[in-house]
From Swiss-Prot:
Keywords from the UniProt entry: Amino-acid biosynthesis, Cytoplasm, NADP, Oxidoreductase, Proline biosynthesis
Superkingdom of the organism of origin: Bacteria
Protein name (database record): Gamma-glutamyl phosphate reductase
Keyword NADP attached: yes
Uppermost EC category: oxidoreductase
Organism: Pseudomonas paraeruginosa (strain DSM 24068 / PA7)
GO biological process per UniProt: L-proline biosynthetic process
Record has NADP as a keyword: yes
Function per UniProt: Catalyzes the NADPH-dependent reduction of L-glutamate 5-phosphate into L-glutamate 5-semialdehyde and phosphate. The product spontaneously undergoes cyclization to form 1-pyrroline-5-carboxylate.
EC numbers on record: 1.2.1.41
SUPFAM superfamilies: ALDH-like
GO cellular component, as recorded: cytoplasm
Length: 421
């Protein structure tokens, strides 16, 4: 690359801005045609995708990448199938662009409503997983946004191969190539440039480790849609149904350990702890979950429960480790969650309607649940189709970010020669 990284990124930004204006007025059928053509291109390019991915895997092994990172990097046949199906699924989702709602007449006689419109240009910064290239590109395309994708250097060949399939889909639908651009330099300065171009980029969505997201949040000159941690809680109320409590608390922790919506701390009302914790602890022990608890929990469950420290309450383990605290009541549970939680997803297990309502009202999280596992906090499970990420911020998008989260609204006003007096 002969041009500087800054010049290169500025060129991508200019091209994306121009493409975004064309995408904003593209018909739904045209966008869907691009998505379906890209899916067909992926299907036809399986050998090419596998070859490119093997280059990345070989480099990763040579560079000492951890097994978990190599697993995330791998494009297995099943994952290619999922990417193809993901593109086709997004094509079936309702197009939010152009929808007008809340139309009303005001005393002056004019009619006012809100129209849903694209954000413009979305920058996506992510690590390892090549499938994110498809998730992000498909959602941005369907919502009328141009996107600049900066994947991890460890996945550069895989991302470039995927991008070629997307470009083929765009070309077949008559959409600009710059609607979806993959950053082709592995120079880390590209990230700094991407997050510092408010004239070209309207929002950044980082997906990766906490260090990456903290850096982007600190340095970005454009808005960021993000979440830092997934410190999720389940609170078992004194009025909980025991079978529901055990089933939900088991699933919330052990269904998968790595996702950001996995429970990390279990809170239990003192009035039900002796009935619910021993059978739950037996399940956790059988599944190899390390338990850490406060003094009351250790007294009840035995010395093999490690002492929970202040740091444990603030930790997202992403591992078979669970912190447990016995609390005096609902108020103490809410206080704990709002003090130590990450405003991601928290659940109460109770048959008491008033307690459920209070929990919903007072827990300050993006998703708050009653008698359901925190593992449901996901765009697909919420009926949004694919998601571009989960936001714990309070402005613009909160919770799983699907198509609607990648849009904004503008006021539209209709009159008949009306003038203000």
């Amino acid at each position: 690359m002969t041009e500087s990284v800054l010049d290169y990124m500025s060129r991508l930004g200019r091209d994306a801005r121009a493409a975004s204006r064309l995408l904003a007025r593209a018909a739904t059928a045209q966008k869907n045609r691009a998505l379906l053509a890209a899916a067909d291109a992926l299907d036809a390019a399986r050998a090419e995708l596998s070859h490119a991915n093997e280059q990345d895997l070989a480099a990763g092994r040579a560079n000492g990448l951890e097994p978990a990172m190599l697993d995330r990097l791998a494009l297995t046949p099943a994952r290619i199938d999922d990417m193809i199906e993901g593109l086709r699924q997004v094509a079936t989702l309702p197009d939010p662009i152009g929808e007008i709602r809340d139309m009303r007449y005001v005393p002056s006689g004019i009619q006012i409503g809100k129209m849903r419109v694209p954000l413009g240009v979305v920058g996506i910064i992510y690590e390892s997983r090549p499938n994110v290239t498809i998730d992000a590109a498909s959602l941005c395309l369907k919502s009328g946004n141009a996107t600049i994708l900066r994947g991890g250097s460890e996945a550069i060949h895989s991302n470039q191969a995927i991008a070629r399939c997307i470009q083929q889909g765009l070309a077949e639908a008559g959409l600009p190539a710059a609607a979806v651009q993959v950053v082709e330099t592995t120079d880390r300065a590209a990230v700094g440039a991407l997050i510092s171009m408010p004239e070209y980029v309207d929002v950044i969505v980082p997906r990766g480790g906490k260090g990456l997201i903290e850096r982007i949040s600190r340095e970005a000159r454009v808005p960021v849609i993000k979440h830092l941690d997934g410190i999720c809680h389940v609170y078992i109320d004194v009025a909980a149904d025991l079978d529901k409590a055990i089933r939900v608390a088991d699933n919330a922790k052990t269904q998968r350990y790595a996702p950001c919506n996995t429970m990390e701390t279990l809170l239990v009302h003192a009035g039900i702890a002796e009935r619910v914790l021993p059978p739950l602890a037996a399940i956790y022990r059988e599944k190899g979950v390390e338990l850490r608890g406060d003094a009351a929990t250790r007294a009840l469950l035995g010395a093999d429960v490690l002492e929970a420290t202040e740091e444990d309450w603030r930790t997202e383990y992403n591992a078979p480790i669970l912190s447990i605290r016995i609390v005096d009541g609902l108020g103490a549970a809410i206080e704990h969650i709002n003090t130590y939680g990450s405003q991601h997803t928290d659940a109460i297990i109770t048959e008491n309607f008033s307690d459920a309502r209070r929990f919903l009202a007072e827990v300050d999280s993006a998703s708050v649940m009653v008698n359901a596992s925190t593992r449901f906090a996901d765009g697909f499970e919420y009926g949004l189709g694919a998601e571009i990420g989960i936001s714990t911020d309070k402005l613009h998008a909160r919770g799983p970010v699907g198509l609607e989260g990648l849009t904004s609204e503008k006021y539209v006003v209709f009159g008949d020669g009306h003038v203000r007096t």
